[in-house]
Design a protein with these regions (language model features):
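Class I SAM-dependent methyltransferase Rossmann-like catalytic core
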Residues: 2-50
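Class I SAM-dependent methyltransferase SAM/SAH-binding core
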Residues: 43, 47-104
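A short acidic, Gly/Pro-enriched loop at the edge of an enzyme's catalytic core
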Residues: 101-114
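A short SAM/SAH-binding and catalytic strip from SAM-dependent methyltransferases
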Residues: 112-127
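A short glycine-rich, Lys/Arg-flanked "PGG" loop and its adjoining helix->strand segment in the class I
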Residues: 127-142
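Conserved class I S-adenosyl-L-methionine
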Residues: 142-174
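Core SAM-dependent methyltransferase catalytic element
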Residues: 180-181, 189-206
């Protein structure tokens, strides 16, 4: 897949350039934001992901932060097999390093929602990945990309590490714009507890 140029070579650099799959080889059964952030994210999912819909939880882990809604199908993706096996919200999952291979093994228009929580800061080729998010979304499907100020700093790209929270909003919006085919992009901002809550929400239009 051709990479829409969003980040320069300098901007996509990481302090730790070793393979990501080695960094994530050991499972981490922790959450990467406080309870207030997670509660706000679950409420946003409840408001945006259609009930009985099909959801793709990209860059997931042992927990998806989805509400108790009975979705038709939930597919997860991540870098640690043990964590994904532990996630009881996933009907299906796969392991793939998106910095090595941006092509998702998923059908066109297969999902009503694509979710990416607390992980976008690690993408070195976000234009290509977001293009894939758009490809697997059905028409009028929703993309929800959430983040806070926490990260593994050695694995976050330079553009993210050096940006303010407002700058990070702009980065994610630029990823959506580079992918093409999205509209009605909005940013949800909140401060439920200590961790600031941000989410970029966009709709797929073919």
């Amino acid at each position: 897949m051709a990479e829409p140029q969003v980040l320069s070579k300098t901007d996509r650099r990481k302090l730790d350039s070793s393979p990501d799959d080695a960094f994530y080889e050991s499972p981490r059964y922790v959450t990467h934001a406080d309870d207030g952030f997670i509660d706000r994210l679950t409420k946003l999912y409840e408001a945006t992901v259609p009930a009985s819909g099909r959801a793709f939880d990209a860059m997931s882990s042992w927990v998806s932060h989805l509400p108790a809604t009975d979705y038709r199908w939930v597919v997860g993706h991540g870098l640690n097999k043990a964590e994904l096996e532990e996630n009881d919200r996933l009907d299906e999952w796969f392991v793939q390093d998106l910095n090595a291979d941006q092509n998702l093994p998923l059908a066109d228009g297969a999902f009503d929602a694509v979710l990416c929580a607390l992980s976008v800061q690690y993408l070195q080729y976000p234009g290509a990945v977001f293009s894939e998010f758009g490809r697997v979304l059905d028409d009028d499907g929703v993309l929800v990309v959430s983040f806070t100020n926490r990260m593994f700093p050695t694995k976050a790209v330079r553009a993210w590490r050096t940006a303010s929270m407002a700058g990070r909003e702009d980065l994610v919006r630029s990823y959506v714009d580079a992918a093409g085919g999205f509209e009605s992009t909005r940013v949800v901002r909140d401060q439920p507890e200590s961790d600031p809550f941000r989410a970029v929400v966009a709709r797929r239009r073919r």
